[in-house]
């Protein structure tokens, strides 16, 4: 029966055209933003260009990397329900090295280049005359930042590649019982290694280095978990979009509404978790009213005497990423409806893009919110890149891990 499945993905010509077209839009947006801002001799003006690149690259890197976290977490939990669409998740995670290289180049230019408007702590003269930066210089310094970034992106890349390679080891033959046990054990061990790296990076140090240090005098102990929740729910939304897309083309016959329901549950649950962290971080800092901490939110929403330039996006962020999932995804039927879950997935991806925008852009433009369409254009370019790389990865290997020991569990999955 398995031989009748559409097990090989053929990239539609129209899909290729769209992905290349979106990348062209992104490249054009980069060029326009460079001409209008990036090439300006005033560092405060050119910082606007680099902030747009930083925001988009970090957001999409963390989002595609979250898909590998999903694979490893479900592997450790022996969650076989996701095996029927695992190859989709693996294909998305194959974007990590490509976007990782782009992100690395941007970060290195910002840290080692002449413009230190975004990362003030990277300027030796600024550190020399700032007691707070000098105190934090053991952690916030260019050498440690570079080494940590190389280890992080390199580790995600190599471990992700290893896990994807192991997944395809049984494509050509059915394993014996002993081989199946060994296969499960090896996958469990390597997934555990990846989870440890993920915990040490995404759940702790990397958001501090890449994003929180944009406001080097400010800190929040919830910041890394906040970033994890935002990127993970976006990653689940991205998986859902690709699964529905392939289902509509007649692929993934063994994936059904039961699997979509669980993907929707993840989106709903982590939208609520994100909101819990959003509220806790905001409420504790705002009502404690310590000037060194409230400055982060005053810069975005203002205080009693004035309205902040990012006030609209700050509250829109909460509406899209909390109220919309709460009101729409709470109902069982909405998580099982292809149209509704796809619409919500796209909305969540955009909502958390906005979340990262309001995290990054105030560091470059604290007094006004820049024209956002060019930033969106760059984001569209990254979407096209993800579409292109994911499709190429899907086309290289069978869409079904047909000899995986847990495949039966995925076939009979019911929720």
Where are these regions (language model features)?
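Non-cytosolic membrane-interface motifs at loop->transmembrane helix junctions
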Residues: 50-56, 85-87, 216-227, 365-377
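TerminUS-proximal long segments
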Residues: 13-15, 125-130, 311, 320-415
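Hydrophobic cores of alpha-helical transmembrane segments in multi-pass inner/ER membrane proteins
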Residues: 62-71, 101-102, 149-161, 229-244, ...
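Hydrophobic alpha-helical membrane-insertion segments
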Residues: 94-112, 269-278, 343-350
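N-terminal signal-anchor module of multipass membrane proteins
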Residues: 1-66
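Transmembrane-helix bundle segments that line or gate the permeation/cavity pathway
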Residues: 57-173, 191-195
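Long, contiguous internal "core" modules enriched in hydrophobic/ aromatic residues
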Residues: 13-30, 36-42, 136-316, 404-407
